[in-house]
């Protein structure tokens, strides 16, 4: 029964969404100033999976939006005093309930990867799409998040031909020693099985 519900969620998400002018339709759009132009706008060839929660381990609040939009109040929580001046972003955030927020159009360069390299190529922000999952490295991600993530990836694969299922990686893989997300709690096999199921 669980697999049936899981598959239904996947098809529900993928049927709703399309890409129009490099933005997903039928999701929340929250524009951020934290982006710039890609050196080669058509070179979108890598998907990077991250995780984030603010404060760490707390879910379902407005603080991720505020961080990405440079509106985080350092007096709200002690943790914010060290991060509120960061200018960072991702293209997408997938929340615990599977709902999705887009901050940056896919043809623009979001500031999610930092110092990074993939297969010998540096500056992954130049050629990647960054997807944040609301979560931590020690708490399991939800079925709704996997369903939404798989649906989003399938749509991105169709829209941007340089992407492939072989070019999906974690932040930890492009910034080893510096970053550890999405962590051991992320089930790569579950994601790949869902993507492969859609191909059948």
Located regions from the model:
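N-terminal amphipathic/basic-hydrophobic helices that include classical n-h-c signal peptides
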Residues: 1-16
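N-terminal catalytic cores of peptidoglycan-degrading enzymes
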Residues: 12-122
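Basic/polar, cationic surfaces and motifs that engage anionic cell-wall
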Residues: 17-25, 122, 127, 136-200
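Conserved, mostly hydrophobic/aromatic
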Residues: 131
